A protein has these predicted regions:
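Structural signature of tandem alpha-helical TPR/SEL1-like repeats
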Residues: 50-59, 81-94, 115-128, 138, ...
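Alpha-helical segment of the N-proximal tetratricopeptide repeat
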Residues: 36-83, 111, 115, 196
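Long, contiguous interaction/recruitment modules in multidomain scaffold/adaptor proteins
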Residues: 2-39, 50
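Canonical tetratricopeptide repeat
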Residues: 74-77, 81, 108, 142, ...
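Structural marker of alpha-solenoid helical repeat scaffolds
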Residues: 64-67, 98, 132, 166, ...
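Helix-start (N-cap) detector for alpha-helical repeat units in TPR-like alpha-solenoids
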Residues: 38, 69-72, 103-104, 137-138, ...
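Terminal, low-structured helical/coil segments at or just beyond the last alpha-helical repeat
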Residues: 28-38, 178-183, 187-190, 208, ...
Length: 253
């Protein structure tokens, strides 16, 4: 099931990329009065999206140039937010037909396939998008999530590490507008949070590593021997903070 959060799809599934040329920037949206008649149709749609008025956004985007892959992608995102995955996919594919190298739309089709548990298909789309836009942190994070769903933990770690390298805040961004959807829903949350702890530990981010490690324990991760032997935690293993965390017997959420 898709749960959409501003900036991403949290499947744990978000609208995460910056707005493209010709669209309103988030800072503008916070200061511009709601006067649709003074805006272009695409800008009107962006403003409706920021206000979570998705049906109105779709109507506004339909008045924008229909030769724009970006507009079709944004309509797809609006349908995605409404939970109409069939319509969302149709609009993403139209965007790709207009611009076969539009990585955002290719990624967004991947998020549809992910929600349908077609993880192989999702991975193929994400890799295709990354071949075009290798610097897109949100797509790397989507790839990692899909690998996790298939139980491919080393591949997940590599993809997530790349995402964090490109954007250290990739898992915490809350951009209200954009053209890229980001997946974040997983099954085994305890194992997921443990893997996230290892990834952040490898990146040297102690605060987030221990935060995710605590979450994994709260979600029921029981293999403390695995935690104790994981080389990613070697730098902190003898600290009192780490010892106290491992000694905890938290109430499972």
């Amino acid at each position: 099931m898709h749960k959409l959060v501003t900036g991403r799809i949290l499947i744990l599934p978000l609208i995460a990329a910056a707005l493209c040329a010709g669209s309103l920037l988030p800072a503008q949206i916070s200061t511009v009065a709601f006067q649709p008649s003074k805006l272009s149709p695409e800008q009107q749609g962006d403003l409706f999206m920021a206000r979570k008025m998705f049906r109105e956004a779709i109507e506004a985007y339909r008045e924008a140039p229909q030769t724009s892959a970006i507009v079709w992608d944004k309509m797809g995102i609006a349908y995605h937010q409404l939970g109409d995955l069939a319509a969302a996919k149709k609009h993403y594919e139209k965007a790709i037909k207009i611009d076969p190298k539009y990585s955002d739309a290719i990624n967004n089709v991947g998020t549809i396939l992910y929600s349908q548990k077609n993880y192989r298909g999702a991975i193929a789309r994400y890799n295709r998008a990354l071949a075009i836009a290798p610097g897109a942190a949100s797509i790397w994070s989507n790839l990692g999530t899909a690998y996790y769903a298939r139980g491919k933990y080393p591949e997940m770690s590599q993809a997530y590490a790349k995402a964090i390298q490109l954007d250290p805040a990739v898992f915490d961004s809350h951009n209200a507008l954009g053209t890229t959807m980001q997946d974040r829903s997983v099954g085994d949350k305890a194992r997921y949070h443990y893997e996230m702890a290892r990834i952040y530990a490898s990146a040297g981010n102690k605060e987030l590593a221990l935060q995710y490690l605590r979450k994994s324990l709260e979600e029921g991760f029981k293999d403390k021997d695995k935690i104790g032997k994981a080389p990613e935690f070697d730098a902190w293993r003898d600290t009192q903070e780490f010892k106290d965390l491992i000694a905890l017997e938290p109430r499972v959420l």
